[in-house]
Amino acid sequence: MIRPIVLVLLCALLIQLLLADPVCDDLYIHGKNKKRTVVKSLFSEEECSKIINEGGVYAKKHTWLKNRHGRYSTTDNEVTDTWSVWDMIKNKISKMMYPKIAKMYNINQSKLGIKEVFLVKYSENGQRKLEYHKDGCEFSFIVALNDHFQGGGTTFKHDQKNIQLRIGDTLLFSGRNEHKGNEIALGTRYILAGFLNYGGNHYCTIRTS
């Protein structure tokens, strides 16, 4: 006869096996999250200008927010479906970013979803940089919207490589890969940033906690 305590342990193990997902294990437990890629000219200069311009109009009316992401907040505003550029951005994500991420990480593209998209502003008279951090999502992207600044770029802690993007270029990576926004010296740097979930909100954190 199986003892009750053994039965409980077997049930717990079975639950863990049922909940297990190799993608989550790779990203959260095994640290296999160092892959990244840069997609050249995913956005046109005209599209980038439209995002910046609409962001400027929105900020004049609502101001720039500085505390939306806790300890590692940026000066930003969330881009939502009330923005005229939303459909264009959403289409770029679903039709161009999702396939790249799915191929890079060998995952099911249909499980990817948008958690948040936001316009970030770094300026010489405001927030100049963002310290090393991990994003609260499985996958992330950064789109360079302008080049009217000196410095900047994104550095990943594991290899210390500073990735500089041209206008319209998009950096795709795992949000679990620790990275930082490098300090700008002059001007204003605008980026479009996005957090992408895999399998739904908190899907992986539940399975790896």
Predicted regions and their residues:
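Basic side chains
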Residues: 3, 68-71, 121, 189
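Catalytic core of non-heme Fe(II) oxygenases with the double-stranded beta-helix
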Residues: 99-209
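Fe(II)/2-oxoglutarate
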Residues: 1-38, 205-209
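Compositionally biased, intrinsically disordered low-complexity segments
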Residues: 5-11, 18, 41-42, 88, ...
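Non-heme Fe(II)/2-oxoglutarate
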Residues: 22-110
